[in-house]
Amino acid sequence: MKNYDVIIIGTGAANIVADAAIADHKSVAIIERGKFGGTCLNRGCIPTKILVTAANRIREIREAAHLGIHVESVHADWAAVSRRMWHKINENDSIRTYYEQFKNVTVYAGTASFVDKKTVRITDANNHTEEITGTAIIIATGGRTHVPSVAGLQESGYITSETFFGAAYPPEPYKSLIIIGGGPIGCEFAHVFNAFGTHVTLVQHNIRLLPKEDESVSAYMLQQFEDYRIQVHLNQDTLSVRTENGEKILTCSDRTNGKKIEVHAEEILVAPGIKPLSDILHTERAGLATDARGYIRTNEFLETNVPGIWALGDCNGQAPFRHKANYEAETLAHNLFSHQPTENWRWVRYDAVPAVTYTYPETAHIGWTEASAKKAGFTVETAINHYSATAKGYALGFEEGARNDGFVKLVLDKDSKKILGVHIVGPEASILLQPFCNLFYCGTQTIQIREAEIASPTAARLRKLPLTRTLPPLSVYTLSETMTPHPALSELTMWTRYYYEKK
């Protein structure tokens, strides 16, 4: 049985940890059951944003008349857009080749599962198995679509974001599409296909669209979807699916009054959220503690309850975003392989995780919503500024009082004037959010304890100090510890730090 200094399960954000371990001359095993690069690069952030950007341009051209630009027709070439997308996805094949060149790295193609606290079994596509052991094990397995139990759904067939970017990818836009789920994934797909001419019906269990956004943003986006003739049914229980005359028919009922409706479409996209892969990983064999949903519990140093095992990314249940996973990976790589004194260890914080939904227009936020801040006991005041109130906003075509007039909303602590949250809906909201992200991370921070019962001896000691960290606002190193919404264009400025020769 082969033994490694480091075993890494998953090749998304965990590649940051792999690179640090390789540079530190550790023997490394990398295990991947799918395509290298993880969800984001292959079936998430990157391919969806290529489709979203094309959809944005379609909308902008169609709406150019209010700027005095008249276009007779728009031809959307789905095949050409798709070729660009697949070209980008296929670039990820080089990631495996990159890691295979290192003498201290072994790449395993297969599904990882625990045998015990130090042993991992790899099962390949031919059902052959091999067991390896590791001194340090990094879990970064991501998540998968949560498919609800709906009568007839399996028999009628459906797609998810995973299968969509695979064999189920359509050669042309669907004529009609039902989307189950009104979170970021469902709303982005609704925008894309609506722009390309698909009749889209969105069915949402929650009483709000994009329920993790501030209520003002949710209301704005619902209005925009309705204006674009996306049919939205909120507060619905999905009851059953059947197929008739080549169409899929979904029956749902209002959760308040029980009224049933039926919606018809060529295809159904299931996107109500994600769940972890703990069952496939067999976390119980390693004695790993998980929460009620199956996510691996981690502390502020990404330690699990099992010494020598860490978890990052979607699998730990904390904000399923690639930029959050990158931030965690940078933190873990620093702590494990930088050879810094433990007093220089970094910790993760989740009170300042930016989030962006790439609809038309974009939504972006960081920190508390108005409602959550009030619930937490803050005395809250807000400030709202609309796009139309700025010269550039007017130049873009926004007018005061118009239904599409986007805005920035600040949620403030009335007593201290501290910014508690920022919420933006409008063009390039993801870029406009970045200055606030930087503000949230600058200055002196004190360790925030998570999962107090999970504590290595080092973690316990650092908590008692308590550990603090100062991030100067003009230091290039501060950029390394500041989250940047992925894949916003603000990465162009924030990631320039990687070209600093002494990084």
Give short role names for the model-derived ranges:
Residues 45, 141-199, 203, 231, ...:
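Glycine-rich dinucleotide-binding loop and its adjacent helix/turn
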Residues 2-4, 20-26, 31-174, 206-210, ...:
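Glycine-rich flavin
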Residues 7-9, 112, 131-142, 179-180, ...:
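Short hydrophobic core segments
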Residues 4-14, 20-34, 39, 46, ...:
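Flexible, glycine-rich terminal cap/loop adjacent to redox cofactors
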Residues 213-214, 220, 312-372, 431, ...:
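A conserved FAD-binding loop/helix module that cradles the flavin
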Residues 154-173, 262-263, 267-342, 435-438, ...:
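FAD-site-proximal beta/loop scaffold in flavoenzymes
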Residues 1-12, 173-183:
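Beta1/beta-strand and adjacent pyrophosphate-binding region of the FAD-binding site
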Residues 72, 106-109, 113-125, 196-300, ...:
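A Rossmann-like FAD-binding core segment of flavoenzymes
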